[in-house]
Amino acid sequence: MSRGWQWLVRICAGLSVLGALHAVVNTALLRRPPALPGPVGRRVTVVLPVRDEADQVADCLAAVLDQRGAGDLRVVVVDDGSTDGTAERVAAVADDRVTLLRAVPPPPGWLGKPSACAQGAAAATDAEVLVFLDADVRLMPDAIASAVAVLDDAGLDLVSPWPRQLTGSAAERLVQPLQQWLWATLLPLRLAERSPRPSLAAANGQFLVVRRSAYDRAGGHGAVRGQVIEDVALLRAVKAAGGRGVVVDGSTLAACRMYDGWTGVRDGYAKSLWSALGGRPAAAVGAAAGLSAVWLLPPLAALTGSRAGLA
């Protein structure tokens, strides 16, 4: 093995070890919600954008409506052109806390989800806290009260409780943990929480909790109207407007099965990662090469008998 190759393997192995150590530190510093939160003393509105979620929306709504200590809770379901009977499932829910809103088509320059979220937020005229939720998320009974408690106790403007990710196939079990691993290894959470730099941000749009005042100050979803990864973009907009926010441990608050098998994983990540890399082929190749070098090269070198691969 050439000396240059050995040095490359050593450097990549060292970076891999540093990333793992940083993930351990981040995991220890990750904010965790209280097990027994106090009641929320203000109006909370859950905005639930849906499109063809007939199989999910009833269970999602049931979990939202069963929240404990969530204050004056309201739910705005924004049906974004469903054709599978989603709206009818929502209309059948006999609870006056639920409002069904038929979304108007996105204006030019807007994507569907930001537009639906913006319409839901606009309908929540007296909300002091907004919760944006995906239909495939199942909340635990104290989820909203616990998330708001983190928001208040840490003096934050936005928190993104990362739900426990459920998997049902080998592809999901292999790929889904990489989302958390990326921000755990690369993003210094406590620095990101304090820093005004928008680039230091991680969020998960499955479950977002934001103060209405901070949301409006940031321009709401209008500020991220054309963003595929609108969750991270919204946190960046909040930070750019002077707010503070961070991802927090949501594994005890919510659960979500994001994709159903390899096809969903492939299509979903192809869309989101391509957008994250700016739609540039060179950036995609560079990112894949860099991540593969750091995380795959050292163990492969070790398997072929290289002591350098063992760092």
Feature locations, PLM:
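Catalytic donor/gating beta->alpha subdomain of glycosyltransferases that bind UDP-sugars
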Residues: 151, 160-183, 213-216, 221-283
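Long helical/loop segments within the catalytic core of UDP-sugar-dependent glycosyltransferases
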Residues: 23-26, 102-120, 150-217
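Short, acidic, metal-binding catalytic loop of nucleotide-sugar glycosyltransferases
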Residues: 62-72
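Acidic helix N-cap motif at the loop->helix transition within catalytic regions
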Residues: 55-59, 84-93, 102, 142
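Membrane-embedded multi-pass helical conduit in multi-pass membrane proteins
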Residues: 27, 283-311
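N-terminal membrane-anchoring/stem segments of glycan-assembly enzymes
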Residues: 1-40, 176-180, 185-189
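Acidic donor-binding/catalytic loop of UDP-sugar-dependent glycosyltransferases
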Residues: 85, 134-150
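Cell-envelope/extracellular polymer assembly enzymes that use nucleotide-activated donors
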Residues: 42-45, 74
